[in-house]
Design a protein with these regions (language model features):
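Gly/Thr-rich phosphate-binding beta-strand-loop-beta motif of the actin/hexokinase/Hsp70
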Residues: 2-33
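A general structural motif
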Residues: 7-8, 67-70
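Short, well-ordered beta-strand segments
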Residues: 13, 74-76
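Residue-level structural signal for beta-strand termini and adjacent loop
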Residues: 26, 37-38, 93
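Glycine-rich phosphate-binding loop and adjoining helix at the ATP-binding site
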Residues: 50-54, 69-72, 79-119
Length: 119
């Protein structure tokens, strides 16, 4: 039986910048349990970026017992739209136009993802 999402003790946080993307796995008190980073601009294709992020996250996920321990993901991104889950025309990112970042991470990780503006 799959556990209730409210019982999962950790969340993934992503601070996305034009140069670096820093990921942290935190508990309910905000204590960082694991972290990793990738170069944001090294991936001109958003799908390659998400794949690299998931790969970089794997050792951190292993430290906390795997993706089954993750409640969701929060993403702070330039021009992030909380209502749509998209990054919209961010000048300091390599991807242009509308980028459905929350949906891409939901699909890749299988957990809910939300985005907010961190310009």
């Amino acid at each position: 039986m799959e556990s209730n999402n409210n019982e999962k003790p950790y969340v993934i946080g992503l601070d996305m910048g034009g140069t670096n993307s820093i990921f942290g796995i935190v508990d309910q008190r905000g204590t960082i349990k694991a972290q990793t980073a990738i170069k944001t601009g090294a991936y001109p294709d958003i799908n390659d970026y998400v794949a690299a992020a998931v790969e970089a996250l794997q050792p951190a996920l292993d430290l906390v017992g795997g993706i089954g321990q993750i409640r969701g993901m929060g993403i702070g991104a330039p021009n992030g739209n909380f209502y749509t889950g998209n990054i919209e025309d961010a000048a300091n990112l390599v991807w242009r136009g509308i980028v459905p970042i929350a949906q891409l991470f939901e699909d890749a990780l299988g957990v809910p993802a939300r985005v907010t503006n961190d310009a």
